[in-house]
Amino acid sequence: LLEEKNAALCDVGSLGAVVPGSIDASGETVLDAHNLDFHNVPLRKLLQEQFPGIPVYIANDANGAALAELYKGAFTGCKTGVLLTLGTGLGGGIILNGKMFNGGMNHGVELGHAYLVDGGEPCTCGNHGCMEAYCAASALTREGRRAMQAHPESMLAEKTGSDPAKITPKLVTDCAKAGDPAATGC
């Protein structure tokens, strides 16, 4: 990135890193980022070792996105805002009275791990029935695979040669847009 911007390390005022998971209250350690298989990773220390002399900050990805919206985006001039992220996981960041809401245990809005369905689909966190297990990219992939197996005549099967490993969220979405009944049911 420095090369791309024609900058040197001495030009960097601080470094911010965001991760899809829970950060401890001190902002030092990634407690759990299941999609990355990070558990109790001292990320701030690791980055400080790689970039000595540069202040390092770590945060939850959705919280970082909400702060970016507060300082430079849609929340500029607002005291309150709610941001939802949807991709590999499901998260959220809340700005209250101009400040990041981190919750009682500093986990912010781990919306993806809110309990939704009793005995439901497995989640990356190890629980079953979390919201993320139903609406994140992994859920779309899972449902696309199920739909392809149940409908061997589907566009999903045709485009992948019936190989479940070739199902992606983009493919499911593209097939649904093209009118594939199997994909539209995902």
Model-derived regions: residue spans:
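Glycine-rich phosphate-binding loop of actin/hexokinase-like ATP-binding domains
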Residues: 76-135
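Short, ordered coil/turn segments that flank beta-strands lining enzyme active or ligand-binding pockets
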Residues: 25-26, 96-97, 177
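Short glycine-rich anion-binding loops that position phosphate/pyrophosphate groups of nucleotides
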Residues: 20-23, 87-89
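Glycine-rich phosphate-binding loop plus the immediately following alpha-helix
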Residues: 58-62, 116-154
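Glycine-rich phosphate-binding loop and adjoining helix at the ATP-binding site
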Residues: 3-15, 21-80
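A mobile "lid/hinge" subdomain adjacent to the ATP/sugar-phosphate binding pocket shared
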Residues: 134-186
